[in-house]
Design a protein with these regions (language model features):
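Interdomain linker/hinge connecting the two RecA-like lobes of the SF2 helicase core
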Residues: 1-69, 73-76, 82-88, 200-211
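Conserved RecA-like P-loop NTPase helicase motor core
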Residues: 93-190, 196
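Alpha-helix boundary/capping residues
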Residues: 16-20, 62, 167, 196-197, ...
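Alpha-helix capping/helix-boundary segments
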Residues: 75-78, 124-126
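Alpha-helical elements of Rossmann-like donor-binding domains used by nucleotide-donor carbohydrate transfer enzymes
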Residues: 54-58, 82, 110, 162, ...
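Short, catalytically relevant binding-site loops at active-site mouths
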Residues: 77-79, 102-103
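Alpha-helical elements of the RecA-like P-loop NTPase motor core of helicases
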Residues: 11, 53, 81, 85, ...
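Non-catalytic, charged low-complexity extensions flanking SF2 helicase motor domains
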Residues: 175-230
Length: 230
């Protein structure tokens, strides 16, 4: 799902993209893997932060229509925190399942019991967020329809599939959207991710092929595949 940048956001994006390309060229010419990794991470951090307000606005609209919303992120300080803070400024309760400072199970239960209408999380496995979950105490999670949003593309198709499965289980259906800034390199990366989800079924070989394509898109095809994974 494309979102549109404001003129100010476009100015920031073009500056960051130019800085990234220059840094990646220098890293590649010196075969400096650490420098290349750092450049790619900085760009992904800044691209995610630029869109935090648009993601929060879309989430707020879904909450207004009665949904409970899952927001999947990869990075904390430049994605999870900004999105959660935007929502809390809109007086929308948010459960935070990321980082090490909170009781993550207590946060999960806040969302499942409806005390928080939104959960922002960065784990791809081992948590249940589906409607009507049967709890350990015999109670059930709320029946409110879940809807999911990828704030950032998961470059690993396998991890993306696992993330989708957090609420798309036990006969519960949770539709997902992938947000990206229209007209940017993120748009192409997002399309590669979606294509990989469509044509593979947890295929390790297929997932590696997608990582190669995305690496080439960023001029990072000389770096190890793990560079694109969180």
């Amino acid at each position: 799902m494309p979102v549109d940048f404001t003129p100010e956001q476009w100015a920031s994006y073009h500056q960051e993209w130019g800085d990234f390309q220059r840094e990646m060229r220098l890293a590649r010419s010196g075969n400096d893997t650490a420098r290349g990794r750092a450049a790619l991470m900085r760009f992904r951090q800044k691209a995610g932060m630029l869109r935090a307000a648009q993601t929060a606005g879309l989430v707020a609209a879904h909450v207004g229509r009665g949904y409970q919303v899952l927001v999947a992120v990869e990075l904390v300080t430049t994605a999870a925190d900004p999105v959660a803070e935007h929502l809390e400024r809109l007086e929308i309760p948010v459960a935070r399942i990321y980082g090490g400072g909170a009781d993550l199970e207590a946060e999960r239960l806040r969302f499942q019991r409806g005390d928080a209408h939104v959960v922002v999380f960065n784990t791809a496995s081992a948590i249940n967020l589906q409607a009507n979950e049967l709890m350990a105490d015999g109670s059930r999670a709320t029946s409110a329809q879940r809807i999911g949003i990828f704030h950032q593309p998961r470059y690993s198709g396998i991890q993306a599939r696992q993330t989708i499965g957090r609420a798309h289980r036990d006969y519960q259906v949770c539709p997902w959207s992938l947000l990206y800034a229209a007209g940017t390199v993120e748009e192409t990366a997002a399309k590669i991710m979606v294509d990989r989800l469509v044509v593979t079924s947890n295929s390790v070989d297929g997932d590696t092929g997608a990582l190669h394509k995305i690496a080439a898109l960023f001029g990072a095809d000389w770096l190890p595949d793990s560079t694109l994974e969180p």
